[in-house]
Regions:
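Acidic two-metal-ion nuclease catalytic site recognized across multiple nuclease folds
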Residues: 122-167
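Active-site catalytic microenvironments for nucleophilic, acid-base chemistry
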Residues: 59-63, 84, 101, 126-130
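Acidic active-site catalytic centers that drive phospho-/nucleotidyl reactions
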Residues: 52, 77, 116
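Conserved non-catalytic scaffold segment of RNase H-like nuclease domains
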Residues: 1-61, 100
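Cysteine endopeptidase catalytic domains of the caspase/legumain-like
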Residues: 41-43, 105-111, 160-163
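A structural signal for well-ordered alpha-helical segments within the folded catalytic domains
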Residues: 54, 118-121
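Histidine/lysine/aspartate-rich catalytic loop segments that bind and position anionic ligands
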Residues: 65-85
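Active-site-proximal helix-loop-helix substrate-binding element of RNase H-like nuclease domains
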Residues: 6-15, 19-22, 81-117
Length: 167
């Protein structure tokens, strides 16, 4: 931990991690480098929700590492796609709700990064792949810089345009 020297009680209740757990871990820089090495050259993130990609980039910017991820970042939001596939869109369901609805075993606690990633993967691999491929998400923490980099996506029910930054 380098920014905050404590974890608020309400956060601790959700994520079940305390300050000592973080102090005993590797640095963010090392973890991010190892993660990106593991991802390889051609990657696309899959998340449960729309905040993880932005938070990763915010932390990478803080540590001077943002250039390692070219934005805008395209990713698959399994929470959004779950809602589409199960006719619950635009409702955003919890990871545990989706696990229960899909009758998947709950062997570990929720709100732990590795466990939640495994649960998200189990849900993701059961989603309708044409629906997945038709519904990528774009994180615009890093906006396009030029007209050539602008993004236009056409979804089944709407279109999305991500324009470049203007001075």
């Amino acid at each position: 931990p380098q920014v905050y020297n404590w974890i608020h009680d309400s956060i601790h209740e959700v994520i079940h991690v305390d300050y000592k757990d973080l102090a005993d871990g590797v640095s963010f820089q090392q973890a991010a480098d190892e993660f990106l090495d593991w991802c390889g050259e051609e990657w696309i993130f899959c998340t449960w929700g729309n905040q993880d990609v932005m938070e990763l980039q915010r932390n990478m910017k803080y540590y001077g590492m943002l250039s390692k991820i070219k934005g805008p970042v395209t990713y698959y939001d399994a929470q959004k796609i779950y809602g589409i596939c199960y006719n619950e869109d635009p409702c955003r369901r919890s990871l545990e709700y989706a696990i229960d609805k899909m009758h998947l075993p709950k062997a570990q606690e929720f709100h732990r990064a590795l466990t939640d990633a495994k649960y998200t993967g189990e849900i993701f691999k059961r989603l309708d792949m044409p629906a997945v491929l038709a519904n990528p998400s774009i994180d615009v923490y890093q906006n396009p810089k030029t007209r050539k980099e602008e993004i236009y996506l056409s979804y089944p029910n709407y279109d999305e345009y991500v324009s470049r930054e203007f001075a």
